[in-house]
Every structure is written in structure tokens, then in C-alpha cells.
Amino acid sequence: MRNTHNPNETEASEDAENDTQSESDLSFDHGSSEKLNRASLPKTQNSAIPQSNALNTTPNESTSQIDSSPKIPSAVPHISTPNPSSGASTPNIKRVSDFKFGEILGEGSYSTVLTATENSTKREYAIKVLDKRHIIKEKKEKYVNIEKEALCILSKHPGFIKLFYTFQDAHNLYFVLSLARNGELLDYINKLGRFNEICAQYYAALIVDSIDYMHGRGVIHRDLKPENILLDDNMRTKITDFGSAKILNSSHGSHEEDTHHADKPQAHSRSFVGTARYVSPEVLSDKIAGTASDIWAFGCILFQMLAGKPPFVAGNEYLTFQSILHLSYEIPPDISDVASDLIKKLLVLDPKDRLTVDEIHQHPFFNGIKFDNTLWELPPPRLKPFGHTSVLSLSVPNASNKHENGDLTSPLGVPSMVSASTNAAPSPVGTFNRGTLLPCQSNLEEENKEWSSILQDDEKISKIGTLNVYSMSGINGNDAFRFFSSLFRKRKPRTFILTNFGRYLCVASDGEGRKTVKEEIPIKSVGMRCRMVKNNEHGWVVETPTKSWSFEDPNGPASAWVELLDKASSISLPFGNHSVTSFSRSIARSAV
């Protein structure tokens, strides 16, 4: 698949040209973020990524400026946006209607990633949809710009997901990205159990070459893990998810002086980024997460490819941190001495003593590997499990045990880019932020008992009712409203439960009393909107980018549901999926 821009695209309409900008328009300005509201935003804005200009732009008069422009030295080639004043023709302004959206690949607190096909070219992409409301509410504007800037800086290397277009509408930001069809590296580790050393050597070489390029351009990822390493059509790696990154000398990133040693103490106000099982010991000690932190994570990934699990695994994050800070891990005895030696030299407590990228290149584990342009031309070895000769099919994995090692989203809450959607295993320490739960009604004790089999521990019913519902896929909610009255007779009565955990469930009971969840309405997904239906006090609509639901409560006002649904959509997600809390880190440090 060649994801290149068509230079022969027709010129945009006059209205679209008025919104055209010489650079991208998705940046935020912390000082003016309060001005970013749905009334002040244009209907649609867009730009293709310029070849040599920055991604940020000076918006037109109808839009609040939402960031100062960082200057980015490199960008996606062959995609440019001429300055409208230059007299050059302007490429089509991208809009949601230019793409046909497919399956959801991943969801996070602030974003959803979907497959999409461009209508005019039939090219397939992964489009990340980021909710402006949540980004501003949670003050995550900086991380949007960091991810965008990092993707642009790294666009000329084959080891990274590429950003092709950016555009926005009144509610969402859209990143049009390359689609890595073969999912996450973690899927294959889970399916094989362990890689043999030939496979591990090849994929480790690709990863370390990408790290070398990334660090050479002043980008520190800070959340490297198998979930953030994707595989393209040719089974070569693509690093993704730069929402946690630090870009040196960036107007959006930190201006701290970075060294390979990363041994300077930091203020406690510094936010943690990363995933518990891959976090470096210097981060747990409140020191700078420098380039050596990525080297530590690379050591964890190499260990996991060869051993089948991360080196630091414990029942909860406190014990995981203790294992990291005490360097408590065991290398399986059947791993070769040369591979064991490399792992030991990567997983070193003091970042000053870890191998540098150049030293990794020279390690005997990579004998026969040339770290030059030819590396990415080598055919990937057929995946084989450790100690076996069977070969894994290169079809897209059906990894039902995906994420059994836990996952922590970046400060954006951004999901993995292009992995197949699967169910995460429950965390041993999963809890909710109790202060944000919906209220429970005291008169629903019988209902709580009746439906207890489908409720989670400590989960209670906040509201229950029999609703008339109609759903439709692939239709914009505004268009859907035109059909609601005529389609009302087709709506089906269903029992819906809204829980204090913020889950909106369509439930059913069969003739034998067995309870099942027929569907969970994704009210926490990015771009979700819930609103009343005009001229119908009993009706409301829930809209997501790919599906809309029309509800009617014949026995009560819609406002009672809408108010609770709005509150439920912002309830904190469980942080038990191996995310790092400051409380656990402080205990771990004090115990060393």
C-alpha cells in the first residue's frame, strides 16, 4: 500500500479555500484554550502536511489561535499545502465526508482510531479522532502537539507510523495515519509464547535502529512497549503513540537539558509518563526520563520477545516497582549466553552504565546485522516460537489474550494505533476513582440483585428503564434526525441500565432467567455526544463517529437520562491496568 498524496486532486470550493491555511491548524495555545469553543470554531479546517513547513498554522479570523508555531525540520514528502496568496492551486481540504470509516481499532480516554478509506483514491488509512472537549478539559493540548510534531520529525524513517493529513471540525481533531495491518508486536509474542533468537534478533535490530534515528533527532519516546510497536504489510516494525514523548528544543516539549545519563533530580510536580512494567528506575526515583529510559524499555522488550513475558511482573504496581528498583528478574536458562549478556547490559539501574545505541550495534548478539539502509530491505524471518520449528501464519492475529500484560495510555489517553480490537484482561488492582461515580438509587436493591450477574464488583445500577431504541451505522447524527420520526415504528423496546461505573448497557433476560449484556453503548468514546431530540421531551440521541442511537423513554423525561449520561461520559476509567500512581511510586521509593 502506497500512502502518497495525489498531486492532481481538484481545487477546493471557494468556501473551503477561505479556511485553507499554509500550515496545519490543529495546534493549541495554552493561553487561549478557553477561547476554543464550538461556537468559535469553523465548520471544517484542514491541511495536508507541508513538505518543509511546520504543522502549525495561523488560523483565519473566525478561529481562535490555539498554538504558537513550532518549526519542524522535516515532514512527510510529496505532500504540501501552497500558500493561498501565492496563486498556486490548493489541494482539496479534507473532511470527514472524504473518508469511509470502518472498524474501530482502538479507543482511549481522548481518542478513537478507526480504519478509513479515502473515497477519491481508495487508499486505506488509520484515522485518529481526538475529542477537543476532553483535550481542553483535561489540559492535554500540549500532548496533541507533541505527538503531531514527533510524527512529522520522524516521517522520513521507515520505522515509524506516518502522518499524512490533519484536519478538524467543530468537535474533533483528525490525524490521518498509515495503517499497519498486522497489528501489534505484542499479539505475536502472545500467540507464539516466545520468539526464537533469529526472529528476536531481526525485530530487535529494527527497533534499535528506529530508536537511534529517533534520539538523533531529539525525540525521546518514553513509553516504548510491545503494544506501541506495530507491524506493517511486510511484517516490519512501526513505532507509534508519541503522546508521551519529549522533544528536545521544542516549543511544546520540555526544555530540560537531556543527557544519556539522565541522573538529575526532578521536582515532584513532574508528571509521570510510561507503563508500569517498562518504566525505568530513574523515573521511579524522580529523575529525568532521558534517552537511557528508552534503552531500558528496549531491554524489557527484548527480554519479553525471548522469555514471553516482561522481566518485571508482579501482582500489583507497588510490587512491580520494587522489582524494578531492586533489579529483581530472572533470565530463563535456555536463553543463549550472548542474548543474556545483552539483556543484563541494558537492564542496569544506573542509566550512566547502560549500553548506548552505538554499543548495542557492536554487541555480539547483532553479529551479521548491518545497521544501515539495507537493514529495512532485508526480508523478515518467518516467525517461529522459541525452541520449535513450527511457523506462525502472517495473517492478522486474533489475539484474544491481547494486553494481558497491561496497558497505560499516554497523557492523551491515546490508544494503540492500528491493532485489532480485543478485550483486555481484568487487572488485579483495578479500581475506580470513587469520587466520580454516579449516584445510586436506594430503591433499586431488587434490580441490583436481579442483574448482579452482569455487574462488576461494587457496581450498582444508577438508572434502569425500558426504552425504545433505534441504531444506525455510518450515518451522521444530523442526517439521522431526519429519519427518526418515520423510523419510530421500527424501534424496539429494550432494557437499558446505566451503572454507577458509567456503563450504559443494553441487557436481556431469557426464558430461563439468564442475564446477558446485548450491547454496551460507548459513551466514553471520543466524539461521543448526547443530546435531546427537538420537539420530543422523551427522546434523546447518542452519537459516535461510526454509529448513532436514538432513544425514547415512554415513561419519563429524556432529561433525566441525558444528565446522567453526560456525567457518566467523563467518569474516570479504571487505573488498575498497570498505570502508575504517585502514591505507589512514593511507597516504592521509600522502601528502597
UniProtKB/Swiss-Prot annotation:
EC top class named in words: transferase
Main location: cytoplasm
Domain Protein kinase: 99-366
UniProt catalytic activity: L-seryl-[protein] + ATP = O-phospho-L-seryl-[protein] + ADP + H(+); L-threonyl-[protein] + ATP = O-phospho-L-threonyl-[protein] + ADP + H(+)
Catalytic activity, EC: 2.7.11.1
Gene3D superfamilies on file: Phosphorylase Kinase, domain 1 (3.30.200.20), Pleckstrin-homology domain (PH domain)/Phosphotyrosine-binding domain (PTB) (2.30.29.30), Transferase(Phosphotransferase) domain 1 (1.10.510.10)
Chain spans, region PIF-pocket: 130-175
Polar residues bias locations: 1-10, 42-68, 80-92
Entry annotation: catalytic residues: D223 (proton acceptor)
Chain positions with Phosphoserine modification: S64, S69
Family matches, as InterPro entries: Kinase-like_dom_sf, PDK1-typ_PH, PDPK1, PH-like_dom_sf, Prot_kinase_dom, Protein_kinase_ATP_BS, Ser/Thr_kinase_AS, Ser_Thr_kinase_AGC
Residue spans of biased composition, Basic and acidic residues class: 27-37
Record-annotated disulphide pairs: none
Gene Ontology biological process: fungal-type cell wall organization or biogenesis; intracellular signal transduction
Xref: SUPFAM superfamilies: PH domain-like, Protein kinase-like (PK-like)
Domain PH: 461-572
Keyword entries, A-Z: ATP-binding, Cytoplasm, Kinase, Nucleotide-binding, Phosphoprotein, Serine/threonine-protein kinase, Transferase
Compartment(s) where it occurs, according to its Swiss-Prot or TrEMBL record: Cytoplasm
This protein's domain notes: The PIF-pocket is a small lobe in the catalytic domain required by the enzyme for the binding to the hydrophobic motif of its substrates. It is an allosteric regulatory site that can accommodate small compounds acting as allosteric inhibitors.
Protein name stated in the entry: Serine/threonine-protein kinase ksg1
Taxonomic path: Eukaryota, Fungi, Dikarya, Ascomycota, Taphrinomycotina
